Amino acid sequence: MVMFYLGNVLKLSLFGSSHGESVGSLVDGFPVGYKIPLDYIQKYMEYRRPGNTIITSQRKEEDVVKIISGMHNGFTDGSPITMIIENKNVISSYYEELKENPRPGHSDYTLYVKYGDFRNYEGGGFLSGRMTAPLVAAGALAKSYLDSLGIKITSYMKSIGEVTCDEIRGDPYNFETRIPDPEKNSLATSLLVDIMKSGDSIGGRIDTIVEGLPPGVGEPFFNSVESEISRAMFSIPAVKAIEFGDGFTLSKMKGSEANDPFTVLDGHILTKTNHNGGILGGMTTGMPVKFSIAVKPTPSIHKKQDTINLISKEKSEITVKGRHDPCVAIRAVPVVECLTAFVLMDLMMMGGFIDRYGNVRGRSLL
């Protein structure tokens, strides 16, 4: 059974494929009477859009979001919101060879096992990174709503290969690698140029910080903040790992080191440290929510690779054609940011912090 939806009260469905006429999202449950900020949504589409720099895929798409339902006179009207993004720069001929020869590291083989000859293999079909475009469109709508409540979500490239950012020194979107540090951005750019020349690719790590969330967001047991964010993050192609707070480092610490002592500041209960990433018992503590994801290298590379012919079961070789990112993690930054917003807004609606009519509970906590 295929389920193309995310969310519990606020729901998101996807449709389309990489080389189809369009891709899109359907958002159901969004509060009524909210003015849809089209310019804001388009800004995040531009952050994700391919072809903007030499270090991203040269598939040049306009990625203009068209809303065909759920909006009346610029405001949400209570019905499902349908967002469509056209595919205009498609070259399917690159993928004919892949019909019988699956790319290592890609979903070509698993799609064949599951759907056989009915699978859509062109451009990766509905499992392509292209499907992150409608994720951004829907997520940017939620992010704008949380922005209005004073909830700030920031995602950035913590590292590309061995180039690591130690501190945020500017807006990540002012740097082409999304590493918010001038020196490290320059180093990463040089690394990516070399990677491209060699026909290879490289992975990266994306860190996210959420500030301004009230305590108590999250629904134990199976709808915890961690489980809901994790489910969403693993819907992003190439994401292979996630950790919250100090994550795996906590396994090496003592309880006296890992526990975050409570304190009071200006009448608000906070913690002196934040090793647990602002989450305890699956619910927010009021401290910043922090998590990191690992994104594997783009599997489509221009180096010759060993594979198997699916029909003959004999060994074969493949050199992937087409236009691909040397580091797919870079364009995933706005995807992570926007999808995080969607999940958190859904959890806030589940917990009664926000209702279908835009009423906000405990506004003073925000």
UniProtKB/Swiss-Prot annotation:
One CC-aspect GO term: cytosol
GO molecular function, one term: FMN binding
Top-level taxon in the UniProt lineage: Archaea
Enzyme class: lyase
Cofactor note: Reduced FMN (FMNH(2)).
Binding site for NADP(+): 48
Reactions accelerated catalytically: 5-O-(1-carboxyvinyl)-3-phosphoshikimate = chorismate + phosphate
Assigned keywords, A-Z: Amino-acid biosynthesis, Aromatic amino acid biosynthesis, FAD, Flavoprotein, FMN, Lyase, NADP
Gene Ontology BP, a term: amino acid biosynthetic process
List of residues binding FMN: 281, 296-300, 323
Protein's job: This reaction introduces a second double bond into the aromatic ring system.
Protein name (Swiss-Prot/TrEMBL): Chorismate synthase
Organism this protein belongs to: Thermoplasma volcanium (strain ATCC 51530 / DSM 4299 / JCM 9571 / NBRC 15438 / GSS1)
Gene that encodes the chain: aroC
